[in-house]
């Protein structure tokens, strides 16, 4: 698996409620396979602490990349949850890449919405 933003192959896996998410150790981005992100955003936020992180370097956030699963070019699109966040989506496998810090922004928006 290669990071779509910084091209490293150094990932750590975090398993939350049976869902495994890969985090790039260099740029702190997160890879979610199909439907994993929406499932996790509906979980109790206390379980999601291992996925929270600092914002990545801006140079990585603007970069277009390829899907780490199938090398399809990722499509950048505004998140329906928080339009201030641009997510990178693979149209082939439906996976989603979030740059460092974007998971936090989405989670905070979900928490505000659910109050």
Residue ranges of each PLM-predicted region?
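Terminal recognition/anchoring or ligand-binding modules at protein termini
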Residues: 92, 99, 103-114
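Short, intrinsically disordered terminal segments enriched in charged and Pro/Gly residues
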Residues: 36-58, 107-115
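Short, solvent-exposed interaction modules
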Residues: 52-96
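Short, recurring structural edge motifs at helix starts
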Residues: 9-13, 17-25, 74-79, 85-87
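Short, structured motif recognition centered on aromatic/hydrophobic residues
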Residues: 30-32, 37, 96-98, 103
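Cys/His-rich microdomains that often coordinate metals
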Residues: 9-11, 31, 71-74, 97
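Short cysteine-rich clusters marking metal-coordination/redox-active sites
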Residues: 3-6, 24-27, 67-70, 90
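Residues immediately within or flanking Cys/His clusters that coordinate Zn2+
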Residues: 1, 21, 29, 64, ...
